[in-house]
Amino acid sequence: MKEATQVAKRALELGNEAAKIKLGEIQEDEKLMKAGFNALKKKVDSGDMHYANSLGYAYEFGIGTSLSIKEAMKYYEMAAKQNNALGMTNLADLYIQEDKLKKAKPLLVKAAKKEYGYAQYLLAMNFFDLYSENNKGALFWLERAANNDEPEALYQLGVYYSEGAEADLAKAINYFQRAAELNHSDAALELSYIYDEGIIVEQDDDKALFFLKKAAELDNQEAIDELAAQALASRAQNGQGNMDAKEAEYWIKKAGYTEEMLKELDKLQEKSLEMFKKMQETNQ
């Protein structure tokens, strides 16, 4: 987050109008987002197509303006006509969501040939079958996307090589590792499981926890819930678990537990202890 903010601020200093809306998005600053949108709109309306894709993005996600897929498509199309690979891909992605695959494919092919990784990934996953016997097309485009450091492609290749007839766990781990380095949360979570269970690699609790925390910091809900469960266990053991009280409190709150919920859990724990003691007394 800090690095992204610094990059956006520097881009803004260098005159990149799109950085203003990105900075507003990062900082959740409505005023800055609106100012950024207005600056982009003014630029594009005056004929500067350099910002057409960014304006389409603002409309698609309602950043600084009301959400409008129709307007998003309009500006993505403007960007695509300028031979902008990102604009082509964003327009194709919206066509895919509307199940208009015939319109999406030529845009993706064109962007993919320009070596845009996400276009290559979308082409592989929407127009070829990775899990069929005839999967050469899917693998071709996924591998090209992976060569362009596309995190989703790296993750999908990791999944592909971790199961089925083509299983190659060493290769899968390599793909997951590369995807995790590019902040793919599901890849980080997979690595956490791999190191926790000692699959192919030596079992390593420290690495398992490292990748679990990385996934959680990237807002992976499954990872957050797992860390919260560990934090609750640590809390129940009066801090005898694998994290200190401050960290435990952080993950518990991150998972959405309220003070009321924690009080109820404490009551349940007390009842469980009482029942356990009674059972012991009965058996003596």
PLM features: residue spans?
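Short helix-capping/linker turns of helical repeat alpha-solenoids
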Residues: 14-16, 46-48, 61-63, 82-84, ...
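Structural motif corresponding to the intra-repeat A-B loop/turn of tetratricopeptide repeats
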Residues: 30, 66, 98, 130-132, ...
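Terminal, low-structured helical/coil segments at or just beyond the last alpha-helical repeat
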Residues: 226-284
